[in-house]
Amino acid sequence: MTTTQALTVRQNATAATALLVGPALMAGYGVVRLVGRAVSDYGPGVWWTLAHLLFLAGVLAFVPVFLGLRGLAGERGGGRTAATVAAWTGLLGAAAVVVQAVIDLTAGFAAADKQAMSEMFDRVQGVPGVMPLVYTVVPMLFWLGLLALVTLLAFLRRDVVRPWAPVLVLAGTVLMAVNLDLLPVGALCLGAALLPVRRGLPG
């Protein structure tokens, strides 16, 4: 086995694990968030920190997911090019979401109470460019890239990506966008869409 082949096998193994772990961590974030809100202690403190650590880990887990899905498109041709564009679009969005999670964690550690944390967020979000780059526009590329990639593979790799997978990804994205309380359900939709892909990763 060549070095390149060994790296590909390792990348696919990582992607296969991440296809399970990524949605699970996001679901965990949603559950912890709900628990924290239920006990009226969702601000600076344990629940906030735990939830956002799970969120950060979940987003990072999608990095190998994007790379693994891109690899399923083949080595060359228009499909590979389109998959590469979709993957890098998703990764750009993931980078913005990671920054958002780090800001949330930092505010949680630094603030003494919810009021102080809110004031910190106001200062950060008041910096020109921060809102579109970190909170509103660029983070959406994560979901758009994932949806585009899964949709593309549903046509290119019907043996691996089920035809209903893009519908589940879209449903999960919409649920999480409409109401953060639906994060666990949305994450389960993502997991159901991505789980069958694991067997298509060569390794």
Residues of each region from the PLM?
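Hydrophobic, aromatic-enriched alpha-helical segments typical of multi-pass transmembrane helices
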Residues: T2-G203
